[in-house]
Swiss-Prot record:
Domain comment in the entry: The Clp repeat (R) domain probably functions as a substrate-discriminating domain, recruiting aggregated proteins to the ClpB hexamer and/or stabilizing bound proteins. The NBD2 domain is responsible for oligomerization, whereas the NBD1 domain stabilizes the hexamer probably in an ATP-dependent manner. The movement of the coiled-coil domain is essential for ClpB ability to rescue proteins from an aggregated state, probably by pulling apart large aggregated proteins, which are bound between the coiled-coils motifs of adjacent ClpB subunits in the functional hexamer.
Gene3D superfamilies: 1.10.8.60, Clp, N-terminal domain, P-loop containing nucleotide triphosphate hydrolases
GO molecular function: ATP binding; ATP hydrolysis activity
Protein name, UniProt field: Chaperone protein ClpB 2
Amino acid sequence: MQPTDPNKFTEKAWEAIAKTPEIAKQHRQQQIETEHLLSALLEQNGLATSIFNKAGASIPRVNDQVNSFIAQQPKLSNPSESIYLGRSLDKLLDNAEIAKSKYGDDYISIEHLMAAYGQDDRLGKNLYREIGLTENKLAEIIKQIRGTQKVTDQNPEGKYESLEKYGRDLTELAREGKLDPVIGRDEEVRRTIQILSRRTKNNPVLIGEPGVGKTAIAEGLAQRIINHDVPESLRDRKLISLDMGALIAGAKYRGEFEERLKAVLKEVTDSQGQIILFIDEIHTVVGAGATQGAMDAGNLLKPMLARGALRCIGATTLDEYRKYIEKDAALERRFQEVLVDEPNVLDTISILRGLKERYEVHHGVKIADSALVAAAMLSNRYISDRFLPDKAIDLVDEAAAKLKMEITSKPEELDEVDRKILQLEMERLSLQRENDSASKERLEKLEKELADFKEEQSKLNGQWQSEKTVIDQIRTVKETIDQVNLEIQQAQRDYDYNKAAELQYGKLTDLQRQVEALETQLAEQQTSGKSLLREEVLESDIAEIISKWTGIPISKLVESEKEKLLHLEDELHSRVIGQDEAVTAVAEAIQRSRAGLSDPNRPTASFIFLGPTGVGKTELAKALAKNLFDTEEALVRIDMSEYMEKHAVSRLMGAPPGYVGYEEGGQLTEAIRRRPYSVILFDEIEKAHGDVFNVMLQILDDGRLTDAQGHVVDFKNTIIIMTSNLGSQYILDVAGDDSRYEEMRSRVMDVMRENFRPEFLNRVDETIIFHGLQKSELRSIVQIQIQSLATRLEEQKLTLKLTDKALDFLAAVGYDPVYGARPLKRAVQKYLETAIAKGILRGDYKPGETIVVDETDERLSFTSLRGDLVIV
């Protein structure tokens, strides 16, 4: 048969035949024979390779034999362009056509060519005999691969073993111990089994937030199936996870995707209920593969799902379920919902304890139980935009990976010694070129120093290598223990209790003794001298990782917060002068909240600061951010004068759908999503439009706010401060007169009630009145301002000193009871900063000098000192 008509062959078969002339040319041969075709089939890495694999043959070995056979054939010294079809290949193609008729197919496919090789006297017969591939065995393998399929089109190979190509057998992975253990989730697994056991609509869909463990439930079911911990209806079933990406990828022609999916579904239905399909991200089937009139995957699934012919478990997030599945009511009714909630912190700790061994073996480190508890608690507290247990597992994984990296990298002490040796070696080279006695003396000293460092290097290197070796040995033994545990489980499943007992009480016990001995050896090495390597993940490692993720400084997480909170009042007093009552009220409210006595579903604290301008309202908010969250950047400042119009209110939460800027999110909500631990300052709230307070009610009462895109933003870890100038005139009237304080307070509160609704005022924790500043208090504020200026001058290597008279002068000229401390800042700029700036520009002050500022004749005088020497 002359292979001139590609329409008689399948695409893959013709592709291999078309490649044979090229292979013959490469080997300078003029006739195309069966060996060239077999070489082309093996190169495809398709059905031919699969047949050889199932026959138990080694593909590289078969390849070598074919190539060796080709190399032995006669070669032409100068081959002509014309290439002929050899007699053996002609006969092979005739036999392939006979095989095609025998199987009742429409096209010659690769399996027909493989069957024809069994009668090929040139190469095929001998090769098959060598690998033990008889005619019956080949027929069995072809039947196993094809199932009940017939070759009715030119691309049948894409439909063979579809589940193997486009799916992962979870039960097989569970049997091999490649799935992580699933802890808890019994209720959800039980409900899934219950739905799978129904007669019709036996399709559960697992719905939950990303990272709560939906896929883990499917894996847990696979583990239960292999442990026979399921009802009779699910005993010995296969759970196969379908990869929608692989199913769609490479489907070039119209209808090819549908063909692949139909082949998968046919394989599942042909199994008579033996296969359960798991589709992760099930929303991807809606609309998948739909192009101009083509059916999408969801519509292909519907008939089978309804009549119970296909048992399918789906998994998707709440948002995607609503967006894709709920829109298609016909698809939705075929699935039964199983809601997967986020586990609480205690359940997460149990999950982490169950996974601990897996991560220890993988990374070759130990993980302390305190680290697991810290991972669950800190991730729950500090990472609000992700869900447990996923975020806690990620923390443990990353902390263990970091420690593993440190073990394999050179220790810091050794690195320092290496650098020092390199530096001394370079110094020695330059000294060897010198001939004077001082250089020779220095060289002698350097040689001794170098010898000492090299000795230390050798000692440290030896210690590092020995510690590293023991840690590696522990890891290897633990991996073996893991493997033995798998073998024990397999033996128990096979009811081979003799083997299980032999492994458990023989091999496993020996390995556990080995681990104990190695751990003791490592402990001795580490206690005998200074340990170079650490092989246990601790609480501090978890805190360090979370600090990198969230930007909250590590000391904030590890340092005893009690200590910090006890000293909060003193810290605030040192920065905010003359507002003792306000500082005490703020500190006490935060202490109550952090001690766990305030409502956990509301913000940490909320205050209204009332008082005239320049008395320290905003300064106290900044000081609070700095002391609680270690940076003033944790202060989210929103100027309410920007929200005077009704339409501007939407800027807080983001523009509604359909408006410009919808994708950008809100100014307030985005800031808190990025940094959930913040002090929020709403400056001058009396200027805001009334609708702003409707938004505030929700934040103050529930500690949450939903932005325009539907994200719920958590305000439970924020401190909310609102400032206002309302009633300032009454506060200034009684400045310094404590006897009239209550009268003033009631008048100020009357003004507040006139301007704000009672439901708003009622939700605020405390309304704090800031007093007008007294002249005596301004001196302390001057010192704070001077300290700030002195710090800036230090960068230019200048020191600043002010006499008491100079301080009193600045306090006097900067005092204005109406404007508070702001005129003081202007006075420091006018009388002090300007004069020093001019002096620096004129060159009066040189680096290293001290600028002494005094007051003479109601003006400041400046003197420059170098040491005790006065420079005029």
